[in-house]
Amino acid sequence: MNFDFDAGFDTETRELRDMVVRFARRELDSSGRFDDAEDFRRRWLLAGKQGLTGTTVPGEYGGSGLDAVSAAATMEALGYGCADTGFAFSVAAHLFAAVMPIVEFGTGEQRAAWLPALCSGERIAAHAITEPEAGSDALHLRTRARPVDDGHVLSGSKCFITNAPVADVFVVQAATDPRGGFFGLTTFLVEASTPGLTVGRPYDKVGLRGSPTADVHFDDCYVPAGAVLGAEGSGASIFSSSMKWERTCLFAAYLGAMRRVLESTVDHVRDREQFGSPIGGFQAVSHRIVDMLGRYEGARLLLYRAARSLSDGTADEVGPALAKIAVSEAAVQLGLDAVQLRGGLGIMDGEAETLLRDALPARIFSGTNEIQKNNVARALGLGRRRPAARR
């Protein structure tokens, strides 16, 4: 397949992308066992040595210091070269949802204590905000952080936490002022070994099976004052900042997976013959391929536009939201089309049905697509308003 994979990248970024693709193909093959915990740790350490777990972290802390565009290119290459999108998702969630808040809001002491090992792959981070009663309504958390001498005591539960079964540190959002709204949340760095912190059994998910996910419980879990990330009451702004990274750079991994499946689908319809000729020559098939390519390219343009705004400091809420919507919806539809064009082979164990299963959660995590549309509508001045009082 011959269409541009460079997106205007400079030579250094193209070389980095190609290196990541080669590494992923050579070292990150899971032999089909995407849910093997021991193999997950092996591959994580290899990814750390390659610099993938700290791409956007400054060099002084062991990272590569990449900007958002180069980081997105790296994640796209990882998604393209690694058949396990769940593993790529775990790397991206570690980096953009948990490590970047430490980079942007941590004290010098916190950065020095955590970032080197998080970059090298020796340690893994997880971001814990979602709760059974607080999904899209993320500001109304029931996990409480009660102030005590020299620290806080955390009580509550989190669910659907990516990397929870393997995490060494959790970036936890908790309510310090339940009535404070946007300013009522505080972010904490909580070590996995902290007394009172327990992790539930890993979920058995329909997709992203290579990404370990579980509940996390805090039972009167004491954390010292030095565990507060940023200022008390700044948790919502920290979360919002991390979501700009996640909705942009994390979703680049899906671009790589889409391209990989799109290429193999084109090869399939060229080779598969029915009625005496390749099925790619049938208009119904060729038009579907063109639609797949158009969705992929459109989503890619939106994502890299959002990445460039992150790099130059002009990012708002709209760009990452549109990128997240476009990529996730394109991935689901591309997966459906790839399955359909393979016929019976599409519902067997293979990369087409794997992409479809891995893409379904993408419309939900990082803020559901419906919530993203609300955010964009509000930015356009179309938010919900109270009805005018009747006279």
UniProtKB/Swiss-Prot annotation:
<dbReference type="InterPro" id="IPR036250">
    <property type="entry name" value="AcylCo_DH-like_C"/>
</dbReference>
<protein>
    <recommendedName>
        <fullName>L-prolyl-[peptidyl-carrier protein] dehydrogenase</fullName>
        <ecNumber>1.3.8.14</ecNumber>
    </recommendedName>
</protein>
<dbReference type="GO" id="GO:0003995">
    <property type="term" value="F:acyl-CoA dehydrogenase activity"/>
</dbReference>
<dbReference type="GO" id="GO:0050660">
    <property type="term" value="F:flavin adenine dinucleotide binding"/>
</dbReference>
<dbReference type="Pfam" id="PF00441">
    <property type="entry name" value="Acyl-CoA_dh_1"/>
</dbReference>
<dbReference type="GO" id="GO:0005737">
    <property type="term" value="C:cytoplasm"/>
</dbReference>
<keyword id="KW-0560">Oxidoreductase</keyword>
<feature type="binding site">
    <location>
        <position position="272"/>
    </location>
    <ligand>
        <name>FAD</name>
    </ligand>
</feature>
<keyword id="KW-0285">Flavoprotein</keyword>
<dbReference type="InterPro" id="IPR009100">
    <property type="entry name" value="AcylCoA_DH/oxidase_NM_dom_sf"/>
</dbReference>
<dbReference type="InterPro" id="IPR054940">
    <property type="entry name" value="ProlPCPDhRedW"/>
</dbReference>
<dbReference type="GO" id="GO:0033539">
    <property type="term" value="P:fatty acid beta-oxidation using acyl-CoA dehydrogenase"/>
</dbReference>
<comment type="similarity">
    <text>Belongs to the acyl-CoA dehydrogenase family.</text>
</comment>
<dbReference type="InterPro" id="IPR037069">
    <property type="entry name" value="AcylCoA_DH/ox_N_sf"/>
</dbReference>
<feature type="binding site">
    <location>
        <position position="283"/>
    </location>
    <ligand>
        <name>FAD</name>
    </ligand>
</feature>
<dbReference type="InterPro" id="IPR009075">
    <property type="entry name" value="AcylCo_DH/oxidase_C"/>
</dbReference>
<keyword id="KW-0274">FAD</keyword>
<comment type="function">
    <text>Involved in the biosynthesis of undecylprodigiosin. Catalyzes the desaturation of the L-prolyl-[prolyl-carrier protein] to yield 1H-pyrrole-2-carbonyl-[prolyl-carrier protein].</text>
</comment>
<dbReference type="InterPro" id="IPR046373">
    <property type="entry name" value="Acyl-CoA_Oxase/DH_mid-dom_sf"/>
</dbReference>
<dbReference type="InterPro" id="IPR013786">
    <property type="entry name" value="AcylCoA_DH/ox_N"/>
</dbReference>
<dbReference type="Pfam" id="PF02771">
    <property type="entry name" value="Acyl-CoA_dh_N"/>
</dbReference>
<dbReference type="InterPro" id="IPR006091">
    <property type="entry name" value="Acyl-CoA_Oxase/DH_mid-dom"/>
</dbReference>
<feature type="active site" description="Proton acceptor">
    <location>
        <position position="246"/>
    </location>
</feature>
<dbReference type="Pfam" id="PF02770">
    <property type="entry name" value="Acyl-CoA_dh_M"/>
</dbReference>
